[in-house]
From Swiss-Prot:
Pathway the protein takes part in: Pyrimidine metabolism; UMP biosynthesis via de novo pathway; (S)-dihydroorotate from bicarbonate: step 2/3
Gene: pyrB
Binding residues for L-aspartate: 87, 169, 229
Keywords: Pyrimidine biosynthesis, Transferase
Family: Belongs to the aspartate/ornithine carbamoyltransferase superfamily. ATCase family.
Protein name in UniProt: Aspartate carbamoyltransferase catalytic subunit
The keyword Transferase is annotated on this UniProt entry: yes
Catalytic activity, as annotated: carbamoyl phosphate + L-aspartate = N-carbamoyl-L-aspartate + phosphate + H(+)
Residues where carbamoyl phosphate binds: 58-59, 108, 136, 139, 268-269
Amino acid sequence: MYAYSHKNILDTLQFSKDDLNYLITKTNRMNALHESGKAFGILHGKLLASLFFEASTRTRMSFEAAMERLGGRLISTVGFQFSSISKGETLYDTMKMIEAYCDIAVIRHPVEGSSRIAAGAVNIPVINAGDGAGQHPTQALLDLYTIVSEKGKIDGLNIAFIGDLKYGRTIHSLINLLRHYPVHLYLISPEELRLPEKYKKNLEGFPMTWEETTDIKAIWDADVAYVTRIQEERFPDHREYEKLKDIYKVNKELVLASKKDTTILHPLPRVNELSTDVDDLPNAAYFRQAKYGVVVRMALLCLSLGVNFD
Protein backbone atom coordinates (compact mmCIF):
# COMPACT_ATOMS: atom_id res chain seq x y z
CA MET A 1 0.00 0.00 0.00
CA TYR A 2 1.35 3.46 -0.91
CA ALA A 3 2.36 5.71 2.00
CA TYR A 4 3.20 9.40 1.56
CA SER A 5 6.07 10.26 3.91
CA HIS A 6 7.21 13.85 3.30
CA LYS A 7 6.99 16.02 6.40
CA ASN A 8 9.30 18.69 4.97
CA ILE A 9 8.95 20.04 1.43
CA LEU A 10 12.37 21.36 0.45
CA ASP A 11 13.23 20.23 -3.06
CA THR A 12 11.36 18.76 -6.02
CA LEU A 13 13.92 15.96 -6.28
CA GLN A 14 12.42 14.43 -3.14
CA PHE A 15 9.23 13.42 -4.98
CA SER A 16 8.69 10.16 -6.84
CA LYS A 17 6.08 9.71 -9.55
CA ASP A 18 3.90 7.86 -7.03
CA ASP A 19 4.19 10.87 -4.71
CA LEU A 20 3.10 13.22 -7.48
CA ASN A 21 0.13 11.13 -8.53
CA TYR A 22 -0.90 10.85 -4.88
CA LEU A 23 -0.62 14.63 -4.40
CA ILE A 24 -2.78 15.25 -7.47
CA THR A 25 -5.44 12.89 -6.07
CA LYS A 26 -5.30 14.49 -2.62
CA THR A 27 -5.50 17.99 -4.08
CA ASN A 28 -8.60 16.98 -6.03
CA ARG A 29 -10.08 15.80 -2.73
CA MET A 30 -9.12 19.05 -0.99
CA ASN A 31 -10.61 21.08 -3.82
CA ALA A 32 -13.91 19.22 -3.44
CA LEU A 33 -13.92 19.86 0.32
CA HIS A 34 -13.06 23.52 -0.19
CA GLU A 35 -15.77 24.09 -2.79
CA SER A 36 -18.38 22.42 -0.58
CA GLY A 37 -17.36 24.50 2.45
CA LYS A 38 -16.15 21.45 4.38
CA ALA A 39 -12.42 22.28 4.53
CA PHE A 40 -12.71 24.96 7.21
CA GLY A 41 -11.71 23.60 10.61
CA ILE A 42 -9.43 20.81 9.39
CA LEU A 43 -6.42 22.65 10.87
CA HIS A 44 -8.22 24.25 13.80
CA GLY A 45 -5.74 24.87 16.61
CA LYS A 46 -2.69 24.74 14.32
CA LEU A 47 -0.37 27.73 13.94
CA LEU A 48 1.70 28.52 10.83
CA ALA A 49 4.88 30.62 10.86
CA SER A 50 5.00 32.59 7.59
CA LEU A 51 8.66 33.61 7.22
CA PHE A 52 9.33 35.66 4.11
CA PHE A 53 12.81 37.16 4.06
CA GLU A 54 12.52 37.94 0.35
CA ALA A 55 9.78 39.79 -1.55
CA SER A 56 6.63 37.81 -2.28
CA THR A 57 2.98 38.53 -2.94
CA ARG A 58 1.36 35.43 -4.45
CA THR A 59 3.25 32.73 -2.55
CA ARG A 60 2.96 34.42 0.84
CA MET A 61 -0.71 35.31 0.46
CA SER A 62 -1.49 31.89 -1.02
CA PHE A 63 -0.02 30.05 1.97
CA GLU A 64 -1.68 32.40 4.41
CA ALA A 65 -5.03 32.07 2.63
CA ALA A 66 -4.62 28.28 2.62
CA MET A 67 -4.04 28.21 6.38
CA GLU A 68 -6.96 30.55 7.08
CA ARG A 69 -9.31 28.55 4.84
CA LEU A 70 -8.43 25.42 6.81
CA GLY A 71 -9.32 27.15 10.08
CA GLY A 72 -5.73 27.50 11.24
CA ARG A 73 -3.96 30.67 12.30
CA LEU A 74 -0.63 32.27 11.47
CA ILE A 75 2.13 34.57 12.63
CA SER A 76 4.44 36.18 10.12
CA THR A 77 7.54 38.21 9.42
CA VAL A 78 8.32 39.96 6.15
CA GLY A 79 11.84 41.10 5.24
CA PHE A 80 15.12 40.95 7.15
CA GLN A 81 14.67 44.49 8.44
CA PHE A 82 11.65 43.45 10.49
CA SER A 83 13.25 40.42 12.12
CA SER A 84 16.06 39.76 14.59
CA ILE A 85 18.19 38.54 11.69
CA SER A 86 18.81 42.25 11.06
CA LYS A 87 20.45 42.30 14.51
CA GLY A 88 22.77 39.44 13.62
CA GLU A 89 20.69 36.47 14.75
CA THR A 90 21.39 33.31 12.75
CA LEU A 91 18.70 31.53 10.77
CA TYR A 92 19.30 28.50 13.00
CA ASP A 93 18.49 30.48 16.16
CA THR A 94 15.48 32.12 14.51
CA MET A 95 14.09 28.71 13.63
CA LYS A 96 14.63 27.36 17.15
CA MET A 97 12.47 30.21 18.44
CA ILE A 98 9.85 29.61 15.76
CA GLU A 99 9.68 25.95 16.76
CA ALA A 100 8.62 27.04 20.26
CA TYR A 101 5.74 29.07 18.84
CA CYS A 102 4.34 27.18 15.85
CA ASP A 103 3.34 23.82 14.43
CA ILE A 104 4.70 24.35 10.90
CA ALA A 105 6.87 26.92 9.10
CA VAL A 106 6.93 28.22 5.54
CA ILE A 107 10.14 30.04 4.60
CA ARG A 108 11.35 32.14 1.68
CA HIS A 109 14.97 33.24 1.77
CA PRO A 110 17.38 34.75 -0.79
CA VAL A 111 20.15 32.22 -0.05
CA GLU A 112 20.07 28.92 -1.93
CA GLY A 113 19.90 25.99 0.48
CA SER A 114 18.52 28.06 3.36
CA SER A 115 15.41 25.92 3.72
CA ARG A 116 17.57 22.89 4.50
CA ILE A 117 19.33 24.84 7.23
CA ALA A 118 15.93 25.83 8.60
CA ALA A 119 14.60 22.27 8.51
CA GLY A 120 17.76 20.94 10.13
CA ALA A 121 17.26 23.22 13.12
CA VAL A 122 13.76 22.10 14.10
CA ASN A 123 11.42 19.14 14.45
CA ILE A 124 8.33 20.89 13.07
CA PRO A 125 7.60 20.62 9.32
CA VAL A 126 9.34 23.18 7.10
CA ILE A 127 8.16 24.12 3.61
CA ASN A 128 10.49 25.87 1.17
CA ALA A 129 8.69 28.83 -0.45
CA GLY A 130 11.71 29.74 -2.58
CA ASP A 131 15.44 29.83 -1.81
CA GLY A 132 17.36 32.21 -4.04
CA ALA A 133 17.90 30.84 -7.54
CA GLY A 134 17.49 27.30 -6.22
CA GLN A 135 14.11 25.65 -5.73
CA HIS A 136 10.45 26.59 -5.38
CA PRO A 137 8.81 23.19 -4.85
CA THR A 138 5.26 24.24 -4.00
CA GLN A 139 5.10 26.45 -7.10
CA ALA A 140 6.17 23.43 -9.15
CA LEU A 141 3.52 21.26 -7.53
CA LEU A 142 0.79 23.79 -8.27
CA ASP A 143 2.12 24.16 -11.82
CA LEU A 144 1.91 20.40 -12.30
CA TYR A 145 -1.61 20.38 -10.88
CA THR A 146 -2.54 23.25 -13.20
CA ILE A 147 -1.30 21.31 -16.24
CA VAL A 148 -3.36 18.26 -15.23
CA SER A 149 -6.43 20.41 -14.52
CA GLU A 150 -6.18 22.36 -17.79
CA LYS A 151 -5.09 19.55 -20.14
CA GLY A 152 -6.57 16.50 -18.44
CA LYS A 153 -3.23 14.68 -18.61
CA ILE A 154 0.56 15.05 -18.54
CA ASP A 155 1.77 12.13 -20.67
CA GLY A 156 2.55 12.99 -24.28
CA LEU A 157 2.47 16.78 -23.91
CA ASN A 158 4.89 19.18 -25.61
CA ILE A 159 5.82 21.84 -23.05
CA ALA A 160 7.75 25.03 -23.85
CA PHE A 161 9.68 26.96 -21.20
CA ILE A 162 10.39 30.52 -22.29
CA GLY A 163 12.71 33.10 -20.74
CA ASP A 164 15.19 32.89 -17.89
CA LEU A 165 16.12 29.23 -17.59
CA LYS A 166 19.34 30.01 -15.73
CA TYR A 167 17.98 31.83 -12.69
CA GLY A 168 14.29 30.89 -12.84
CA ARG A 169 13.76 28.63 -9.85
CA THR A 170 10.17 27.84 -10.85
CA ILE A 171 11.51 26.28 -14.05
CA HIS A 172 14.23 24.36 -12.22
CA SER A 173 11.62 22.93 -9.87
CA LEU A 174 8.93 22.06 -12.42
CA ILE A 175 11.36 20.32 -14.77
CA ASN A 176 12.40 18.05 -11.89
CA LEU A 177 8.77 16.95 -11.56
CA LEU A 178 8.03 16.63 -15.26
CA ARG A 179 11.01 14.29 -15.76
CA HIS A 180 8.85 11.45 -14.39
CA TYR A 181 6.46 11.70 -17.36
CA PRO A 182 6.87 11.03 -21.11
CA VAL A 183 6.77 14.68 -22.21
CA HIS A 184 8.90 16.70 -24.61
CA LEU A 185 10.35 20.05 -23.56
CA TYR A 186 11.31 23.04 -25.68
CA LEU A 187 13.82 25.05 -23.64
CA ILE A 188 13.60 28.51 -25.21
CA SER A 189 16.14 31.03 -23.95
CA PRO A 190 19.04 33.22 -25.02
CA GLU A 191 22.42 31.49 -24.90
CA GLU A 192 23.31 33.42 -21.74
CA LEU A 193 20.30 32.07 -19.85
CA ARG A 194 20.41 28.37 -20.72
CA LEU A 195 19.23 25.78 -18.22
CA PRO A 196 22.24 25.01 -15.96
CA GLU A 197 23.97 21.68 -16.50
CA LYS A 198 23.16 20.42 -13.00
CA TYR A 199 19.45 20.48 -13.87
CA LYS A 200 20.03 18.74 -17.20
CA LYS A 201 21.85 15.94 -15.37
CA ASN A 202 18.75 15.39 -13.23
CA LEU A 203 16.86 14.39 -16.39
CA GLU A 204 19.13 11.49 -17.33
CA GLY A 205 17.45 8.09 -17.21
CA PHE A 206 13.91 9.46 -17.23
CA PRO A 207 11.25 9.27 -19.98
CA MET A 208 11.32 13.03 -20.68
CA THR A 209 12.97 14.34 -23.87
CA TRP A 210 14.08 17.91 -24.47
CA GLU A 211 15.74 20.31 -26.88
CA GLU A 212 17.24 23.78 -26.54
CA THR A 213 16.56 26.66 -28.89
CA THR A 214 16.73 30.45 -29.04
CA ASP A 215 13.71 30.60 -31.38
CA ILE A 216 10.50 31.64 -29.64
CA LYS A 217 8.52 30.22 -32.56
CA ALA A 218 9.08 26.79 -31.02
CA ILE A 219 6.03 27.71 -28.95
CA TRP A 220 3.94 26.94 -32.05
CA ASP A 221 4.37 23.20 -31.41
CA ALA A 222 3.66 23.39 -27.68
CA ASP A 223 0.60 22.14 -25.82
CA VAL A 224 1.68 24.19 -22.80
CA ALA A 225 3.79 27.37 -22.86
CA TYR A 226 5.35 28.35 -19.53
CA VAL A 227 6.54 31.96 -19.71
CA THR A 228 8.86 33.51 -17.12
CA ARG A 229 10.31 36.95 -16.52
CA ILE A 230 14.03 37.64 -16.70
CA GLN A 231 15.15 37.56 -13.06
CA GLU A 232 16.63 41.04 -12.61
CA GLU A 233 17.49 40.51 -8.94
CA ARG A 234 19.72 37.47 -9.69
CA PHE A 235 22.05 39.15 -12.22
CA PRO A 236 25.53 39.98 -10.88
CA ASP A 237 25.96 42.55 -13.69
CA HIS A 238 22.95 44.80 -14.29
CA ARG A 239 24.20 45.65 -17.79
CA GLU A 240 23.68 42.02 -18.76
CA TYR A 241 20.10 42.22 -17.52
CA GLU A 242 19.44 45.37 -19.55
CA LYS A 243 20.71 43.58 -22.64
CA LEU A 244 18.42 40.57 -22.17
CA LYS A 245 15.33 41.86 -20.39
CA ASP A 246 13.17 42.34 -23.49
CA ILE A 247 14.54 39.53 -25.63
CA TYR A 248 11.24 37.60 -25.74
CA LYS A 249 7.63 38.74 -25.66
CA VAL A 250 4.66 36.42 -25.80
CA ASN A 251 1.76 38.40 -27.24
CA LYS A 252 -1.65 37.65 -28.72
CA GLU A 253 -0.30 37.41 -32.26
CA LEU A 254 2.24 34.75 -31.25
CA VAL A 255 -0.32 32.75 -29.27
CA LEU A 256 -2.88 32.83 -32.09
CA ALA A 257 -0.21 31.47 -34.45
CA SER A 258 0.29 28.51 -32.09
CA LYS A 259 -1.96 25.50 -31.53
CA LYS A 260 -5.54 26.53 -30.86
CA ASP A 261 -5.51 25.07 -27.36
CA THR A 262 -1.96 25.92 -26.25
CA THR A 263 -2.26 26.62 -22.52
CA ILE A 264 -0.33 29.73 -21.44
CA LEU A 265 1.13 29.63 -17.94
CA HIS A 266 3.21 32.14 -15.98
CA PRO A 267 4.23 31.94 -12.29
CA LEU A 268 3.91 35.74 -12.03
CA PRO A 269 4.81 38.51 -11.51
CA ARG A 270 5.20 39.45 -15.16
CA VAL A 271 7.10 42.43 -16.53
CA ASN A 272 7.41 42.77 -20.32
CA GLU A 273 7.61 39.12 -21.37
CA LEU A 274 3.86 38.43 -21.44
CA SER A 275 1.56 40.98 -23.04
CA THR A 276 -1.75 41.87 -21.40
CA ASP A 277 -3.44 41.33 -24.77
CA VAL A 278 -3.16 37.58 -24.06
CA ASP A 279 -5.29 37.89 -20.92
CA ASP A 280 -8.65 37.67 -22.68
CA LEU A 281 -7.81 34.46 -24.55
CA PRO A 282 -9.52 31.34 -23.15
CA ASN A 283 -6.22 29.45 -23.04
CA ALA A 284 -4.56 32.11 -20.84
CA ALA A 285 -4.47 30.10 -17.62
CA TYR A 286 -2.06 32.04 -15.40
CA PHE A 287 -4.71 33.58 -13.16
CA ARG A 288 -6.38 30.18 -12.78
CA GLN A 289 -2.88 28.87 -12.03
CA ALA A 290 -2.65 31.25 -9.06
CA LYS A 291 -6.08 30.12 -7.85
CA TYR A 292 -5.07 26.45 -8.00
CA GLY A 293 -2.16 27.37 -5.74
CA VAL A 294 -4.41 27.84 -2.72
CA VAL A 295 -5.95 24.33 -2.79
CA VAL A 296 -2.57 22.74 -3.56
CA ARG A 297 -1.07 24.44 -0.52
CA MET A 298 -4.09 23.54 1.60
CA ALA A 299 -3.42 19.89 0.78
CA LEU A 300 0.33 20.23 1.41
CA LEU A 301 -0.14 21.88 4.81
CA CYS A 302 -2.39 19.03 5.93
CA LEU A 303 -0.08 16.34 4.60
CA SER A 304 3.02 17.88 6.20
CA LEU A 305 1.20 18.09 9.53
CA GLY A 306 -0.06 14.52 9.20
CA VAL A 307 -3.70 15.64 9.33
CA ASN A 308 -6.10 13.38 7.46
CA PHE A 309 -8.75 14.89 5.18
CA ASP A 310 -10.20 11.86 3.40
